[in-house]
Regions:
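N-terminal loops that bind phosphate or other acidic moieties
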Residues: 2-133, 137-375
Length: 375
């Protein structure tokens, strides 16, 4: 029997690999001769960098970059030496969690630190990039990131237009001659799970701006500024990605990646499953095990476990899911390629007790053992 395990992290309790290894131990208790492969799993959002560092023998690279409100922040990315790949989350450098609610200012917030992370990875030798862009604090169209990478944004007086959302309307000329030449050799894949265009009522400012501090009175102003920036970009580069699905992601960062860096935007789970080479292991798998901290209706809507399950079904494998907790709505997962799912809790306890790492590991192992005794 070949068993492939790819389970998302149980946030605050077990990492993806820790959960996978706990399941492996349980399977081996029931099936000592089983061939078992454990792969890291994430959806391109929070925790993706950590999952791939741990699951693909990566190295954590710590660095100090310019934060969203221009003060230095500690950020990090993953370095996968074998493939010269950098795995990073823009939120590490310009995330909304780095900005207290009372200091949010979309007119000033910058993505400059994201560009600094990319520069650092390029200098280290990385030529492949996997970048998650969820959880941003910015609405600057990616101007900050691009400035860090060498692009100049000039106003009508041919001086620097500044940074943040306030700079967008001032841009009169764009000079890309200083763009880091190493980017010509780079292949950038962006994990993007939103389809919003750059501008308009479904664009970045109107949909995501309010959570970043955009007031009702600022929406029209910032959206028009974003459209102006897109127009100057199109005039300069001869491309138009303004209405491309995902262009509005991360305050227009999606647009910047498409227009200036030749990146591809891919649903997060698809990108991660490809990066970890999961499908290659599924061709001869008998059973696939997946799961996450909580199985519910959102899981069935296409979160990481369902992505694994659907891929497994292409190869006719049975799919089992384990979770810390399971809601009534999780029954929808059975219609989304998960054959059976099981909560791992074994007795009534507090949330803190359930999330204790040692307890969760023991529960995961015990549940896996009992389930696999039936197979």
């Amino acid at each position: 029997m070949k068993v492939v395990i790819a389970i998302d992290s149980l946030k605050g309790s077990l990492s993806s690999i820790e959960a996978g290894m706990a399941i492996k131990e349980g399977v081996l208790r029931a099936k000592p001769d089983a061939r078992i492969v454990v792969k890291p799993l994430a959806d391109g959002g929070e925790g993706t960098t950590d999952a791939l560092i741990e699951g693909m023998n990566g190295e954590r690279i710590d660095l100090t970059v310019t934060g969203p409100m221009h003060a230095p922040v500690n950020a990090y990315y993953g370095y996968l030496k074998d493939s010269n790949t950098a795995v990073m989350e823009m939120a590490s450098a310009a995330g909304i969690t780095l900005v207290p609610d009372d200091t949010k200012d979309p007119l000033l917030a910058t993505s400059y630190g994201v560009g600094e992370m990319i520069n650092h990875a390029l200098q280290k030798g990385c030529r492949n990039f996997i970048i998650g862009i969820g959880g941003s604090a910015t609405n600057d169209g990616g101007i900050g990131m691009l400035k860090a990478l060498g692009v100049r944004f000039l106003d009508e007086n041919d001086v620097d237009a500044g940074e943040g959302g306030q700079a967008l309307a001032k841009v009169s000329r764009i000079d890309i001659s200083g763009l880091n030449p190493l980017l010509r050799e780079a292949h950038i894949q962006v994990a993007c799970d939103v389809n919003n265009p750059l501008c308009g009522e479904n664009g970045s400012t109107y949909v995501y701006g309010p959570q970043k501090g955009v007031t009702e009175n600022q929406k029209k102003q910032l959206d028009e500024a974003m459209a102006h920036f897109a127009q100057i970009t199109s005039k300069t580069l001869g491309t138009d990605y303004c209405n491309t699905p995902g262009a509005g992601a991360a305050g227009g960062l999606g647009f910047a990646f498409l227009s200036y860096l030749g990146a591809t935007l891919t649903p997060g789970i698809e990108l991660i499953l490809s990066a970890v080479g999961l499908e290659q292991e599924l061709s001869d798998a008998d059973v696939v095990v997946t799961g996450e901290g909580r199985l519910d209706f959102q899981t069935a809507m296409g979160k990481a476990p369902v992505g694994v399950a659907k891929l497994a079904k292409k190869h006719y494998a049975k799919v089992i899911a384990f979770a810390g907790s399971v809601t009534k709505e999780a029954a929808a997962c059975n219609k989304e390629a998960i054959d059976a799912f099981f909560p791992i809790l074994r007795n009534i306890c507090t949330l803190a007790e359930a999330m204790d790492s040692a307890t969760a590991k023991a529960n995961m192992t015990a549940t896996a053992e009992q389930v696999f005794r039936l197979l």
